[in-house]
Amino acid sequence: MASSMLSSAAVVTSPAQATMVAPFTGLKSSAAFPVTRKTNKDITSIASNGGRVSCMKVWPPIGKKKFETLSYLPDLSDVELAKEVDYLLRNKWIPCVEFELEHGFVYREHGNTPGYYDGRYWTMWKLPLFGCTDSAQVLKEVEECKKEYPGAFIRIIGFDNTRQVQCISFIAYKPPSFTEA
């Protein structure tokens, strides 16, 4: 018992603890930092990207159908679709092919609550492609879906089964009868 008391007393009086870093004493005064205030109330002077501020046009809300991710771009070619699917697979997301026969875009039919839209849920083509490692497999399923339903909109989604969320969704095919108007 005496030896255990002796060793604990030796630890408490150790000179190594006396040389530890000083405790935190607080932040330095902000008086050392210069404060500049602009008196100009012009809205263009508020935002800055390091150069001259220029305004961008907004997406026209009338006559343009909104689809999924990348809907503002021209239709994707087969090579571009393969690259998107490769990206999906690199992120370890599960690819899934879905189709919609009537509306390939969000619309309002049953609800008028802000933020509520119909047309978000599409019909799944077969099962999700669990274990898929090649974009050619996914594009083959898209082609099969096109043959079965030539008048359908087809999209590819990427599902993260760890977080249980849909991470990406993009249109893979629009029917020939569809017009953008």
Swiss-Prot record:
Main subcellular localisation: plastid
GO CC, any one term: chloroplast
Entries under PANTHER family matching the protein: RIBULOSE BISPHOSPHATE CARBOXYLASE SMALL CHAIN 1, CHLOROPLASTIC, RIBULOSE BISPHOSPHATE CARBOXYLASE SMALL SUBUNIT 1A, CHLOROPLASTIC-RELATED
Species annotation: Arabidopsis thaliana (Mouse-ear cress)
Name of the protein this chain belongs to: Ribulose bisphosphate carboxylase small subunit 3B, chloroplastic
Encoding gene, per UniProt annotation: RBCS-3B
UniProt keyword annotation of Chloroplast present: yes
Further comment found in the protein's record: There are four genes coding for RBS in Arabidopsis thaliana. The basic functional RuBisCO is composed of a large chain homodimer in a 'head-to-tail' conformation. In form I RuBisCO this homodimer is arranged in a barrel-like tetramer with the small subunits forming a tetrameric 'cap' on each end of the 'barrel'.
Subcellular location: Plastid, Chloroplast
